[in-house]
Amino acid sequence: MNILIFSNAMKEQDFALYQSEAKIKPNPSNQNFYYKLIKTLAINNNVSVVSHRPLVKGMFRKNYLEGDTVFDGKIKFYYTTNRCDKVFKLLKEKSVIVKTAKQAIDDFMSEDFIIITDTLRLNLLKAAKKVAKLYDTKIIGMLTDNPFNLSSGSAFVKKYLVEQASNLDGYLSLTNGLVEVFNSSAPSYVFEGLVCEESEGKKDPIFNYFYFGGSLYERYGVKTLVDAFHKSNVKNKLVIAGSGPLAEYIEQMAEDDYRILYLSQLSKEKNIAYMRNSIANINPRPLDPKMDNESVPSKLLEYLSIGTPVISTKFPKLFSTFKDDITWIEGNSIEDMKYALEHYEVPNQEEYLKKAATARRKVFEFYGLNVQAESIDHFIAEINSSTKN
């Protein structure tokens, strides 16, 4: 089957270069998820990606990105041109994406294909819908979050985005709650995420530390983690990596508390190395019925796939599966976090490692690329066949 994906995702090596050169660091979570989705779809299908790379003013020395076409194994990435100016965004961006998609379709040498699109980037979504209409083909939306949960963008744009994404032919979704937000009557396949084998990045640690790597937002529990650690009697260090609004606060806390180390945004390889060598990786995202219903803490699945012990809040969708394999934080408060950190018994690390190995086996059984590829392919085939009825 030919699959055309509309996304911001890039070839992994290209994203690493893009991230290293960017003055304003992009959040890698979108890249990480979509790249795994692309690899999953490419296991049994012919996949091309229309990649509209993120670009904001001041991100690079030049305020534009040139188009290009690159191979990643048998996957073909079609990079669109992109500019920072408002005229381009308002009048030209969608048509540039459509033009790039037409090139990808010509290279399929067949108009028998199906579209999968990001649903959180407005012009990308509108371009995907236009291409679907031009070629009379089915379009599936990938639901990763509710636009109203995002920190940027006006309420009007978020409402419009949901409206634009609410009339697609089907949905791949990370939660049932997202299907309810966009279109509960359309066909959908729900899976909490994807995990894959990562490069070793293994080095002997020079000190014992707990680790968090991700977006530095208070709503994700990062401030609670830092404050709890600062108040704790833990002798080991806390290493924080990532970028976001709390970066300045964490830098200040690191100056005040020698046990806290802030590393800013790391490359994927360094992030993996820190995860592999930690005493335990921490998912501090607080329990919140709305957020839990509409988004998945992707870091938790990533941590589980590494095989290092995990300390986490009780995300409902994963708690029952990994009940005995994770050190659970009982609540959302600083005291709950402090208790979990202080009662993590480092002398019993071998027992924690055994639990981590069990968790790793389970997470690949449920969310490994090959496992999910079969289910996702079956769903896409059902959507695609409905065009011929």
Feature roles, as predicted:
Residues 1-63, 170, 227-233:
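N-terminal subdomain of nucleotide-sugar transferases
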Residues 4-6, 201-220, 225-230, 238-239, ...:
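Conserved donor-binding/catalytic core segment of Leloir-type glycosyltransferases
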Residues 33, 144, 148, 161-201:
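Donor nucleotide-sugar binding/catalytic pocket of nucleotide-sugar-dependent glycosyltransferases
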Residues 34-39, 123-126, 130-135, 143-171:
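Membrane-proximal helix-turn-helix segments that form the acceptor-binding/catalytic region
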Residues 56-58, 90-100, 115-134, 329:
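An aromatic- and histidine-rich active-site surface loop
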Residues 220, 269-274, 283-302, 311-321:
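Nucleotide-sugar-dependent
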Residues 248-275, 280:
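Nucleotide-activated donor-binding/catalytic signature segment of Leloir-type glycosyltransferases, i.e.
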Residues 326-335, 342-349:
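Conserved acidic donor-binding segment of nucleotide-sugar-dependent glycosyltransferases
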